[in-house]
Amino acid sequence: MVEYVVSLDKLGVHDVEHVGGKNASLGEMISNLAGAGVSVPGGFATTAQAYRDFLEQSGLNDRIHAALDALDVDDVNALAKTGAQIRQWVMEAEFPARLDSEIRQAFAALANGNDNLAVAVRSSATAEDLPDASFAGQQETFLNIRGVDNVIRAAKEVFASLFNDRAIAYRVHQGFDHKLVALSAGVQRMVRSETGTAGVMFTLDTESGFRDVVFITGAYGLGETVVQGAVNPDEFYVHKPTLEAGRPAILRRNLGSKAIKMIYGDEAKAGRSVKVVDVDRADRARFALSDAEVTELAKQAMIIEKHYGRPMDIEWAKDGDDGKLYIVQARPETVKSRASATVMERYLLKEKGTVLVEGRAIGQRIGAGPVKVINDVSEMDKVQPGDVLVSDMTDPDWEPVMKRASAIVTNRGGRTCHAAIIARELGIPAVVGCGNATQILQDGQGVTVSCAEGDTGFIFEGELGFDVRKNSVDAMPDLPFKIMMNVGNPDRAFDFAQLPNEGVGLARLEFIINRMIGVHPKALLNFAGLPADIKESVEKRIAGYPDPVGFYVEKLVEGISTLAAAFWPKKVIVRLSDFKSNEYANLIGGKLYEPEEENPMLGFRGASRYISESFRDCFELECRALKKVRNEMGLTNVEIMVPFVRTLGEASQVVELLAGNGLKRGENGLKVIMMCELPSNALLADEFLEFFDGFSIGSNDLTQLTLGLDRDSGIVAHLFDERNPAVKKLLANAIAACNKAGKYIGICGQGPSDHPDLARWLMEQGIESVSLNPDSVLDTWFFLAEGQDQA
């Protein structure tokens, strides 16, 4: 006789057809990974045979399939009516006596005398969680169910949920035969995360598909709020190779608003067993996980990924009573892990518009169309093909119409919620967690939704033009020098790392300071003495971090380490901050500390600033961050570049200052490069090279200073050309000096990106690397290869 109920510890991946993907996976982890440190709560599962016999013995099979055969799933109203009818039939039917009895016996064994045991009752479909089909969230989950009668009712609710509107539509669209899909109910001991935290993690970056990170989201209370997208969670990125090396490996921390949490309700039966409450303001301003917990979760994720041999989508929970971290689900990631690695598809806006709303970007595409604000699932049928669907949050029930939309925008949700997962699967751009999109965007208004700018997604006014470029990158032609990239935005690092490249020739700190920090370092050093209004602004920025100075250093560490990890083990040359005084003044508190200069471009910047008494303590914070990235995290692919070194005296002083702050040339393989961007640098190249390990040519400033041009002046802008003979003479001098000394020589200015013929000339001069803007890498690479063939 076939069993109707099986203990989870008796199951493994080979049991998908008996208990569905979810329950088979839980059994696999309990059986094989407990010894490796993966904690999974115990429980039992009903079998697919139990489900089939229930439908057969109750006479439901023929009625259900007759109703489905007559249904057009694209008719949203008919779908809702048929789905509701079938679910009602299932709930009204009685379980076979043997199934009822076996559930009672299994629950008694699990409870072991604890009459008040709380369990989760989850669905597990036999076609769910297969490597090439994501049924994420299509069937129901019931949390905090107590008492065996409530468990049996919840199991029946789970069976009925196979006929949710979204599940019916999804099976039709994916070509799954309704008759071949069966359901198993998993009953699992609850992790007490209502007093702890919970969330989702992926063993790759969900947007770019970058494989060397674990991406973790978390919020307070039960994990359903994160999965549903009802809350904007905290986010963390952990670098796998660094973690495997036993070093601190957290690359990024993004503080989410975490406004609500789901906790146990007053009743213990399906539908009333949980409730949502507000989170205290103080808890919102803290990260829901400690660094140690983030690291522990990442380790468990890597163990699971290694066991399954593929990228995984994992749900986790922290028990508020015992403080332990548990894995409550694991399934194969089904979108990015199947994407082609040999064809790069890039979306590029042709024009910029007014930004109306912004949030978290899902995918890397662009969509445009008229806004359709949907406040309730009953309004779903209003969405027409090409509309931009705007809502507070999307429920998986909305899936039947989501595929009609050109883009999706929500007030709430993070990158691992259902809306995000489904949008990725459908290839539709989505911006989630916008906060107020439903108030700002108006029905019928034309907008453009762009997820092609990095972590932040933008909704622009008007339907803007955009291009889609596809390039094959599986076999790039050889060149006699390295093509590197100029990258400033850590949000784009994992994405840009997918392009053919030899590393980063210019990583700018300015973007990190501007976007991720936004506060003048002096204001953080002098926090106690700040005026009240500035202090309040700073306090909002530093939420989640222990102190103002620690915030500055850690944010620099996060930005630099993300860039270094994305391209590891390739070289990443990080340029020390090169803000001018007017740019520093624009940071919070900046006007208190910056001089007013007539021409900041030629003023207090670069090495002069670092060695000055007024800025040296700020510069030392940059040194602390770089030292942590290289020496503690072990990301020794980071090299340092010093900009705007006017004299040999400055060169000597700045190298000495770096060494005094633990960044000594040659120590732990450290190379210190000088940005060759003043005529004095090229004219005295041999002398400057005594202090540095090479040059990176900054062609923008070198051209400006050689030709006596203000590059910000429109009047003389037409004379600005890096190919001017005087500029090329200085370039040739710098290249020859570095080659003679056997030291690094590259170029990171705008010139080669704008003028591929200049890149070809540099190649002929014997330059070691050309660092380009990411959007010109492929075109320039192919142009140079063709020129080489013709030569």
Swiss-Prot record:
Broad class of enzyme this protein falls into: transferase
Glycoprotein among keywords: no
Top-level taxon in the UniProt lineage: Bacteria
Entries under InterPro entries matching the protein: ATP_grasp_subdomain_1, PEP-util_enz_mobile_dom, PEP_synth, PEP_util_AS, PEP_util_C, PEP_util_CS, Phosphohistidine_dom_sf, PPDK_AMP/ATP-bd
Functional pathway: Carbohydrate biosynthesis; gluconeogenesis
PROSITE patterns: PEP_ENZYMES_2, PEP_ENZYMES_PHOS_SITE
A GO biological process held by the record: gluconeogenesis
EC id: 2.7.9.2
Chain residues that bind Mg(2+): 677, 701
One MF term in the entry's GO annotations: pyruvate, water dikinase activity
Keyword Transferase: yes
Residues forming coiled coils: none
Binding site for substrate: 508, 575, 677, 698-701
Modified residues (Phosphotyrosine): 744
Catalytic activity: pyruvate + ATP + H2O = phosphoenolpyruvate + AMP + phosphate + 2 H(+)
The protein's required cofactors: Mg(2+)
Phosphothreonine modifications at: 416
The protein's role, per its UniProt record: Catalyzes the phosphorylation of pyruvate to phosphoenolpyruvate.
Protein family per UniProt: Belongs to the PEP-utilizing enzyme family.
PANTHER family assigned: PHOSPHOENOLPYRUVATE SYNTHASE
Leftover remarks: The reaction takes place in three steps, mediated by a phosphocarrier histidine residue located on the surface of the central domain. The two first partial reactions are catalyzed at an active site located on the N-terminal domain, and the third partial reaction is catalyzed at an active site located on the C-terminal domain. For catalytic turnover, the central domain swivels from the concave surface of the N-terminal domain to that of the C-terminal domain.
Protein name: Phosphoenolpyruvate synthase
